[in-house]
Amino acid sequence: MVGVADPAAAPRIAEVLRLLGTERAFVVHGEGLDELPLDGTGVLYDVSPDEVARREIDAQALGLSRASTSALAGGDPATNASLLEAVLRGESGARRDVVVLNAGAALLAAGRTETLESGIELAALTIDAGLASELLGRLRAEKRRADAAVAAAPQPQGASA
């Protein structure tokens, strides 16, 4: 799934992906964002080797809350990490809704579900079961191990840290 903020660029990128022989991909944008929005209609370009199909996505029609882009605003990296952790711990609200909407679309693009609705449901269940938070913890642990391995690796002759 590729997010594109520029509505004019999104169909062009989708067509390039098709021409490159992409098996399945989604190019999404909405209301100036590089993701599907909660405050209006988002657009999803469904890319396959044969075509690019344009689909409008209305989050409210999918049972999600309506929220302005400003209500979803984050901040610096530490703030954004904290906001994501809260969603992955099960906090409800607009931030969770935008996460499950976009994760649901990614699950559909990856062939894990048959419909966007079932993708949203699977994303929500994954959060509610604690699996998303658990995965984030495993990714962090793996990053720490990789960082330690890099730091412990011998430096090439003449290299400076």
Located regions from the model:
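Glycine-rich anion-binding loops and their surrounding alpha/beta cores
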Residues: 1-161
